[in-house]
Every structure is written in structure tokens, then in C-alpha cells.
């Protein structure tokens, strides 16, 4: 019911905040995947090249996904 949705929303907001505040991390492999990360200094989703492994949660395949999760 309502209580579960409230708890679920709380955890989603905590996860969302943590992901969006993580720094850009290209990873340690040498692939070249175009991705987007949320730049907390500018408040915008910015393109970068992801190496394919490692990295963190602030790594989105599309601009739309970055904006939707980080509310940019």
C-alpha cells in the first residue's frame, strides 16, 4: 500500500542522489562506448566515452535516461 510506496520512493531518491553525484569514470578497459553522465557542477548530462568495464552508476546509455534519473 501507501507505506510501501513511500519507502520505495525514499530508497529510489537515495540511490538516485548517490548515482548522480558520483564523478565521471571512464573505466579501465579500452573500448569506446558513447555514454552520458550527470555533471553535478553544471547540473547537466554530459557526453563521455566509456571504456567498457569498471566505472560507476553515473553512466547512462542515452541522454534521456540520464535526464530522467538525475532530473536534468
From Swiss-Prot:
Location (main, coarse): secreted
PROSITE patterns documented for this protein: BPTI_KUNITZ_1, BPTI_KUNITZ_2
Keyword set includes Lipoprotein: no
SUPFAM superfamilies in the record: BPTI-like
Bridged cysteine pairs (disulfide): 20-70, 29-53, 45-66
Lineage top rank: taxon: Eukaryota
Temperature-related properties: Thermostable. Optimum temperature is 25 degrees Celsius. The ability to inhibit trypsin slowly decreases as the temperature increases to 7% inhibition at 100 degrees Celsius.
Signal peptide limits: 1-9
Important for the stabilization when complexed with trypsin (site feature) positions: 61
A Pfam family annotated for this UniProt entry: Kunitz_BPTI
Keywords, comma-separated and alphabetical: Cleavage on pair of basic residues, Disulfide bond, Ion channel impairing toxin, Nematocyst, Protease inhibitor, Secreted, Serine protease inhibitor, Signal, Toxin
Residue ranges constituting the BPTI/Kunitz inhibitor domain according to the UniProt record: 20-70
Subcellular location: Secreted; Nematocyst
Site (Reactive bond for trypsin): 30-31
InterPro entries, A to Z: Kunitz_BPTI, Kunitz_BPTI_sf, Prtase_inh_Kunz-CS, TFPI/VKTCI-like
Residues that make up the propeptide removed upon maturation: 10-17
Gene3D superfamilies reported for this sequence: Pancreatic trypsin inhibitor Kunitz domain
One cellular component (GO) term of this entry: extracellular space
Any GO MF annotation of the entry: ion channel regulator activity
Physiological role: Serine protease inhibitor that acts on trypsin (Ki=190 nM) and to elastase. Does not bind to alpha-chymotrypsin, cathepsin G, and kallikrein. It significantly increases neuroblastoma cell viability in an in vitro neurotoxicity model, being a consequence of an effective decrease of reactive oxygen species (ROS) level in the cells. It also protects cells by inhibiting ATP-induced purinoceptor activation. Its binding affinity to P2RX7 is moderate (Kd=45.5 uM).
Similarity section: Belongs to the venom Kunitz-type family. Sea anemone type 2 potassium channel toxin subfamily.
Extra remark beyond the main annotation: Negative results: does not show activity on all potassium channel tested (Kv1.1/KCNA1, Kv1.2/KCNA2, Kv1.3/KCNA3, Kv1.4/KCNA4, Kv1.5/KCNA5, Kv1.6/KCNA8, Shaker IR, and Kv11.1/KCNH2/ERG1). Does not exert any effects on TRPV1 channels. A synonymy between H.magnifica and R.crispa is controversial.
Stated name of the protein: PI-stichotoxin-Hcr2j
Organism field: Radianthus crispa
Organism phylogeny: Eukaryota, Metazoa, Cnidaria, Anthozoa, Hexacorallia
Amino acid at each position: 500500500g501507501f507505506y510501501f510506496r513511500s519507502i520505495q520512493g525514499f530508497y529510489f531518491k537515495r540511490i538516485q542522489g548517490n548515482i548522480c553525484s558520483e564523478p565521471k569514470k571512464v573505466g579501465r578497459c579500452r573500448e569506446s562506448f558513447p555514454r552520458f553522465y550527470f555533471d553535478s557542477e553544471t547540473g547537466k548530462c554530459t557526453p563521455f566515452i566509456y571504456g567498457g568495464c569498471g566505472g560507476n552508476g553515473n553512466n547512462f546509455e542515452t541522454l534521456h535516461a540520464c535526464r530522467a534519473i538525475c532530473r536534468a
